[in-house]
Amino acid sequence: MGTSLYRSTLLSTGGFSVSDYIRKFTKNKPDVNNIQPNVGFCHQSTQTSQQVKEVISAELELQQPEVTLPNDPSSQHSPEAHTGASEPLKPVSAGESSKALQKAKEISVKSSEPTHVQTFAPAVHLEQIDVHNVPKQETNSLVAAPADAKCVIETMTKVEKDIALQQERALERADDSHVANKVFLKSIIPGQQLEKIEDPQQQAEVSLFVDEDSLEKSVPGQHLDKKMEVLQKQAKDLPVVDEDSLNLSAPGQRQLEEKVDVPEKAEKKIDEAHKKMEEVPRKDELCIEKPVIRHAGIKTQHEETMGMETTVPKHDESKCPTETYVEKTENKNADVTLESDKIMICAVSPQNTSLDEDEKSKAAPLRKVESTLLIIDDSPPLPAPFDHRIVSAKQVPINSYYAVNPVEVLGGGRFGQVHKCAELSSGLTLAAKIIKVRGMKERDEVKNEIGVMNQLNHVNLIQLYDAFESRTNLTLIMEYVEGGELFERIIDESYQLTELDAIVFTRQICEGVQYLHQQYILHLDLKPENILCVNSTGNQIKIIDFGLARKYRPREKLKVNFGTPEFLAPEVVNYDFVSFPTDMWSVGVITYMLLSGLSPFMGDNDAETMNNILHAKWEFDTEAFENVSEEAKDFISSLLVSAKCSRLSASGCMKHSWLNNLEDKAKMYKVRLKSQMMLQRYLVAHRQWKKHFYAVAAANRLKRFQQSRSISTPN
């Protein structure tokens, strides 16, 4: 019977010979010629894709069996060479199986893909440790078949001792396993020599893989059936051996690859198929934890560590390998939704946590600085709550459109009083300036003010909303400003008015005056009482009271004899022609008062005051200007000049160094600018939003990528 049946391969643990088992179990069984070998595929590492199947079929169709005669010296390897080659084996009888080694066939193994593993047992799914369920990353493992119970016990003892160390090194070995063992199984022919790994550890760990197509080509069916029946029974009794402990060492892998003999055409086709496989993006590059796809009878690494029980689940022999693969593919497709959800969580939640921590760390010193340093409000004022409009006086009762509160008085003067009111149709809060008129001259002056305000549309100038005319009064409905007069802040000793505050106020005044002069309008009554603060805490201002304003025409000589004495320009006192520099003198006086709280030309009476103005008798008070910068003094000196042509214009003031580089001045005075703080907060919020946007966009791309892969996966 030894001559009629092909000699089995030697399982190199303890000199065990499969031929003894073949004789034992096939002694009284008749040969069956028509039965085809039932060789199955076992899912050892991960699911097998259609491209992997194409690679395997290409290799099997194009490979040529390599026949080595038993007595050929070239097929023998030197036992002295420690290169992983096998020693020549001698044939043995039935009674001498444990003492003599038989001549076995030379086997060269080449796996078609790192994710595809074959085994003898078609109906057995070995238990695996799914460290990283990622394609193209699991290592090829060769499953050992122990010879007897003693070998099995020794192997399991070794596995249990090394399981803790294997858990720690699992991720490292998974990353280093990209260099796969590309080996394939050649046909088994009588007389060939069996490759044997001389490494002591590998002698107990090598397993053989038999390809169904190659067996059909090279082995008669009747003998193969008997042999496969024996091997199937033997495989059912085998315990599961840890996958990582059975990996071939790098030298052994290289020695096996040296034995590969594939035709050039087959190599080209295989390389092309491998390139197609490598074009698919690897999931391990996505840096995303993926849910473990669980199958019946398969434990995860954590479960195996906790339970330490290795059992081989029973397999229904009615199921063919193709059905098993389809079932696993369906399970993989079913878990795509869970995987996508996990991608969203991993891509957003951890990053959001890190972003929040970063923003908190950045915001902590910012809050500390805000609490210790003085904050200067340099933000520009908001525009009026209504659009600019052209207004004409209506000769209808004001009570039909507005509800005026006669008790709440906002201000007053020579013209009358200002009351708070509200529009009946919209509820908009406004201010009603009620001016008493006794004759046509006064009425014309008020209508002139309406005409001037119709031309003004600037954030630093008060806006006109509506106007009403009656027999005794003219009422102007204007924008409501609640902060009070700038003069009140100047004289308030409890209010801390710094030089930077004065810069902010002066710059806004110059901006408003510049706009007036661009419209060829002269205010002619600029003073702190006619400059209102938008609110009680901020530094935003609006210029009001255009009752004395005039339209400037260069060809017409304009003279005025009115105004507040201490703010009058020399040309007004002399009753000379007025022009744009007249307003700039008033700006210089206001700036002097903002920095010192004093009036530069104030005398004991109005006559002395105007005399000081005519002769330009003023100086910087030593005590008041002790801590004022030279730039501020130069700015004032450039405005309080007797000659009109020598004064700075509004545009020139805007270019002066004192009104610019506010950020540098804030650092020098160790204060904070509100606009700078708002800008920093905006930039921090914008960066945080941008990071969140990129995280969500990346998660969406990954989700679409997973969906496309699930659609392209064959069923």
Curated annotation (Swiss-Prot):
SUPFAM superfamilies: Protein kinase-like (PK-like). It is found in: Cytoplasm. ATP binds at residues 410-418, 433. InterPro entries: Kinase-like_dom_sf (IPR011009), Prot_kinase_dom (IPR000719), Protein_kinase_ATP_BS (IPR017441), Ser/Thr_kinase_AS (IPR008271). Its main location: cytoplasm. Its EC number is 2.7.11.18. The keyword Iron does not apply. Pfam families: Pkinase. One of its GO terms (cellular component) is cytoplasm. SMART domains: S_TKc (SM00220). Residues 67-114 are annotated as: Disordered. Keywords: ATP-binding, Cytoplasm, Kinase, Nucleotide-binding, Serine/threonine-protein kinase, Transferase. GO terms for molecular function: ATP binding; myosin light chain kinase activity. Kinase that phosphorylates MYL2 in vitro. Increases cardiomyocyte contractility. Required for sarcomere formation in the developing heart. This is Myosin light chain kinase 3. The gene is mylk3.
